[in-house]
């Protein structure tokens, strides 16, 4: 028998060739009525097609395993034999009439029953459109976030859909225009910010991304509402592209950063002065993060913090001079490729050094360094959190390089002396080290989140209050909350009402509800958001300065919306944003049905999210796509609104998509979280495979069409999982894809790899065991698509190059899709569309492979006959 398909290694698809739209596909395991040769022919699934007898030596068989019909012709002589010598029987016309009448009655009853019992949505579904890639980028599906921000006890600033910026007073229920949308449009501004005194607006335009959060751009100032724009520049340069600019907490004071130096302006119109001048481009960063701090530690590009009264500025000084340099090549646009060098610490290499400084802004500039803890475990450290407690006290969290010891200190901004307030230690790693404490006005009491033992499931994250007593060096510490659930964020402290407001998973791990708790007495809790907004269980919130009002942002599962509430009775005052245009678009589409399920495994649960087609039936066979993320501490199963390429796979191509949170995931206790320590991939594979096995037990899943996809760390997992064997040691997955996969953790960022695998160089066994090179030798049969931008600054193309070397040695069947000179985050909308089409088309073709194999087999059998 001839080969069913030609295996290949090293097939490289350029951006022109891969996403060519596939032919009309039928992923549901059967042919549509327009293809099967007759209006009444019943569609066959892949199994039925494989089992159906094939016609031998005759014509009429269609491609793709169509059902074939054999006709036996009768000769004229046969007709004569039937006609000659036959006597017509006597017919009972009365009986025939009665029988016909009964048949008509029965048929009418059947038709009536079908009409009555058919759900109304089935009729409406046929009128709805399927979700397409174009929809993902259309205005109809674009969620508008008003970016509402409280600026007083009763006022907040927000932006309308058309771009106009308004000030809303909840007490008088009136609004004032601050910036017309047309003005923002005329300036081509990407971002805006209003000064604290509401006199000026700061705009940025011609913004150029650097990494995930950082960018450079031009800035202008404009008097509200109709002033002419004034360029914001350092005294020595005109028309300068700045790395950052932003207002302070008072009046019109602002700072901006140029060439890693900090400039301060007391008010608009006054010349800026350089207050920090030790910066060196690409090497010494003042007030800004380098790559490692932006991506893995602070998770923002901003590394400076104003005191509440605006008299001081704390800033981080990050020195990359000893950090090895990575070079990102640029292949297009010039005859010879060029490179962009930047400092990137990999596992075991030199890390950036960091120090925290405070400068006074009133009078002569005085720079004072805050002293790190005098602890031998802190020989190398990260600064993970900075928060002002008062105008002279600043809280700092110091984390050792191994990331298993952290110390929270309160530093005196006038002396630089730091006092230890809390210490945490773990045998594994310390999670959630960016959490900001919330302080009382005098700074003597503060609330922070720490992990507290809660029984067999390990520790959960809860609110603790620390109170310092006058004339005493000891602090009184009490836990405000407890239970086998997590506080995810502290929002506000109402000192007058003795209440703390926070978000938690107490309802369910996949939800985020808004709660309050008393800070005195028995710490009673109350859910403020439960059953408050229809079809909303995942919230974030912000409170007015007086705590009398709050903005409630619904993030799912329904279409996101923002409402304004009174804190006293939770009563909704008005809707700020409902995204009606998105609701209409959703109602006009065949959106996936979302189901949640828990699998019980030994002593833990495995939460699953299942996306099914809107037209789902138990009798149809659907392909299964497993989507993995699984970065330790993350969560894939959450009740958040999302329309993604996975939605397109379900809606337009009839796939079932499943996600799950196994060992290593967050919000289920530290025991489950820390189980993956020093063995990344091993336990995640077992849990993800358990989810797949559970789905394969369902009669509606086609066992011959199962795929896996992941990006970043999920790309590592999808590559790790793809060769996994199922029952009887057979292949589970037909195909798989990885986007920017991590393939060797010693090539990845130091802070990430060392957090989970330990310090490289001391014991490298964990690094060797987690290499995917050990797994790819089994990838001879499955289709494997690797996608990687060549200028990926987070997960270098080096990872994919190493992987491909192993794939070639293993004679694996793979395809490679590259994006020349594109960064990790795909800032271009057109490239994102191309990316999504590439992924979707790959899986569509993969899920059609069984039909192709059946067709080839049928043709070969016919040739043999």
From Swiss-Prot:
One of its GO terms (cellular component) is membrane. It comes from Homo sapiens (Human). Pfam families: DPPIV_N (PF00930), Peptidase_S9 (PF00326). The gene is DPP6. Residues 1-88 are annotated as: Disordered. The chain crosses the membrane at residues 96-116. Its main location: membrane. It is linked to Familial paroxysmal ventricular fibrillation 2: A cardiac arrhythmia marked by fibrillary contractions of the ventricular muscle due to rapid repetitive excitation of myocardial fibers without coordinated contraction of the ventricle and by absence of atrial activity. Homodimer (in vitro). Interacts with KCND2. Identified in a complex with KCND2 and KCNIP2. Forms an octameric complex composed of four DPP6 subunits bound to the KCND2 tetramer. Interacts with KCND3; this interaction modulates the channel gating kinetics namely channel activation and inactivation kinetics and rate of recovery from inactivation. Glycans are attached at residues 173, 319, 404, 471, 535, 566, 813. Genetic variation in DPP6 may influence susceptibility to amyotrophic lateral sclerosis (ALS). ALS is a severely disabling and lethal disorder caused by progressive degeneration of motor neurons in the brain, spinal cord and brainstem. Promotes cell surface expression of the potassium channel KCND2. Modulates the activity and gating characteristics of the potassium channel KCND2. Has no dipeptidyl aminopeptidase activity. InterPro entries: AB_hydrolase_fold, Peptidase_S9_cat, Peptidase_S9B_N, Serine_Prot_S9B/DPPIV. This is A-type potassium channel modulatory protein DPP6. Keywords: Cell membrane, Disease variant, Disulfide bond, Glycoprotein, Intellectual disability, Membrane, Neurodegeneration, Signal-anchor, Transmembrane, Transmembrane helix. It comes from the Eukaryota. Belongs to the peptidase S9B family. PANTHER family: DIPEPTIDYL AMINOPEPTIDASE-LIKE PROTEIN 6, PROTEASE FAMILY S9B,C DIPEPTIDYL-PEPTIDASE IV-RELATED. GO terms for biological process: protein localization to plasma membrane; proteolysis; regulation of potassium ion transmembrane transport. Residues 117-865 are extracellular. It is found in: Cell membrane. It is a single-pass type II membrane protein. Expressed predominantly in brain. One of its GO terms (molecular function) is serine-type peptidase activity.
């Amino acid at each position: 028998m001839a080969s069913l398909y030609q295996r290949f290694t090293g097939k490289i698809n350029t951006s022109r060739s891969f996403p060519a739209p596939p032919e009309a596909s039928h992923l549901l395991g059967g042919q549509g009525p327009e293809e099967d040769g007759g209006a009444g022919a019943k569609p066959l699934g892949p199994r039925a097609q494989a089992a159906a007898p094939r016609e031998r030596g005759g014509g009429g068989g269609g491609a793709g395993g169509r059902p074939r019909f054999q006709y036996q012709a009768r000769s004229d002589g046969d007709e004569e034999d039937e006609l000659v010598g036959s006597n017509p029987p006597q017919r009972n016309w009365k009986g025939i009439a009665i029988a016909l009448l009964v048949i008509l009655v029965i048929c009418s009853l059947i038709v009536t029953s079908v009409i009555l019992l058919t759900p109304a949505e089935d009729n409406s579904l046929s009128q709805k459109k399927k979700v397409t890639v174009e929809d993902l980028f259309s205005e109809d599906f674009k969620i508008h976030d008003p970016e509402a921000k409280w600026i007083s006890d009763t006022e907040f600033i927000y932006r309308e859909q058309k771009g106009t910026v308004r000030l809303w007073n909840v007490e008088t229920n009136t609004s004032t225009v601050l910036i017309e949308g047309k003005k923002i449009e005329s300036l081509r501004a990407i971002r805006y910010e209003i000064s604290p005194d509401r006199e000026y607006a700061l705009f940025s335009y011609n913004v150029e991304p650097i990494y995930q959060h950082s960018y450079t751009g031009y800035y202008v100032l404009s008097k509200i509402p109709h002033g002419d724009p004034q360029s914001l520049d350092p005294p020595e340069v005109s028309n300068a592209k700045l790395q950052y600019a932003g207002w302070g907490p008072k009046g019109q004071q602002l700072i901006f950063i140029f060439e890693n130096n900090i400039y301060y302006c007391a008010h608009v119109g006054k010349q800026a002065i350089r207050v920090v001048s030790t910066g060196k481009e690409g090497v010494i960063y003042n007030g800004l993060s380098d790559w490692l701090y932006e991506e893995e530690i602070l998770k923002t590009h901003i590394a400076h913090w104003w005191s509440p009264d605006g008299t001081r500025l704390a800033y981080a000084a990050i020195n990359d001079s000893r950090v090895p340099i990575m070079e990102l090549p640029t292949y297009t646009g010039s005859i010879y490729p060029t490179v962009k060098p930047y400092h990137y610490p990999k596992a075991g290499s030199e890390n950036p050094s960091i120090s925290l400084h405070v400068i006074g802004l009133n009078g002569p500039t005085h720079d004072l360094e805050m002293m790190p803890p005098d602890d031998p475990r802190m020989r190398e450290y990260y600064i993970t959190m900075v928060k002002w407690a008062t105008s002279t006290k600043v809280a700092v969290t110091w984390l050792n390089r191994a990331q298993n010891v952290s110390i929270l200190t309160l530093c005196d901004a006038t002396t630089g002396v730091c006092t230890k307030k809390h210490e945490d230690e773990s045998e594994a790693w310390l999670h959630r080290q960016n959490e900001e404490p919330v302080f009382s006005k005098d700074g003597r009491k503060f609330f922070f989140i720490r992990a507290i033992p809660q029984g067999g499931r390990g520790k959960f994250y809860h609110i603790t209050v620390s109170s310092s007593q006058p004339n005493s060096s000891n602090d009184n510490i009490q836990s405000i909350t407890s239970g086998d659930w997590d506080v995810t964020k502290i929002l506000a402290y109402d000192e007058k009402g003795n209440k703390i407001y926070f978000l938690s998973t107490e309802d369910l791990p996949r939800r985020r509800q808004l709660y309050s708790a008393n800070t005195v007495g028995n710490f009673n809790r109350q859910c403020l958001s439960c059953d408050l907004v229809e079809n909303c269980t995942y919230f974030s919130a912000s409170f007015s300065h007086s705590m009398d009002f709050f903005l409630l942002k619904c993030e799912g599962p329904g279409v996101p919306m923002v409402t304004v509430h009174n804190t006293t009775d939770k009563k909704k005052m008005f809707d700020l944003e409902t995204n009606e245009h998105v609701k209409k678009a959703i109602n006009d589409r065949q959106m996936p049905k979302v189901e949640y399920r828990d699998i019980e495994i030994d002593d833990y649960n495995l939460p699953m999210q299942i996306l099914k087609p809107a037209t789902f039936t138990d009798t149809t066979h659907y392909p299964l796509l497993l989507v993995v993320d699984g970065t330790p501490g993350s969560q894939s199963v959450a009740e958040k609104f999302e329309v993604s390429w996975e939605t397109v796979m379900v809606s337009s191509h009839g796939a079932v998509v499943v996600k799950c949170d196994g060992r290593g995931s967050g919000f289920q206790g530290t025991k489950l979280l820390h189980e993956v320590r020093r063995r990344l991939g091993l336990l995640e594979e077992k849990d993800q495979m358990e989810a797949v096995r559970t789905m394969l037990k369902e009669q509606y899943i086609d066992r011959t069409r199962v795929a896996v996809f992941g990006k970043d760390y999920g790309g590592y997992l999808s590559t790790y999982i793809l060769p996994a064997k199922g029952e009887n040691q057979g292949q589970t997955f037909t195909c798989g894809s990885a986007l920017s996969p991590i393939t060797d953790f010693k090539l990845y960022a130091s802070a990430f790899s060392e957090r989970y695998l330990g310090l490289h160089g001391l014991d490298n066994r964990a690094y060797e065991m987690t290499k995917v090179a050990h797994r790819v030798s089994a990838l001879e049969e499955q289709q494997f698509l690797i996608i990687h931008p060549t200028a990926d600054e987070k997960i270098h193309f080096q990872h994919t190059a190493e992987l491909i070397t192993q794939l070639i040695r293993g004679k694996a069947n793979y395809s490679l899709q590259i994006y020349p000179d594109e960064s990790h985050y795909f800032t271009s909308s057109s490239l994102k569309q191309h990316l999504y089409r590439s992924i979707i088309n790959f899986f569509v073709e993969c899920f059609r492979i069984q039909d192709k194999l059946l067709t080839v087999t049928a043709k070969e059998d016919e040739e043999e006959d």
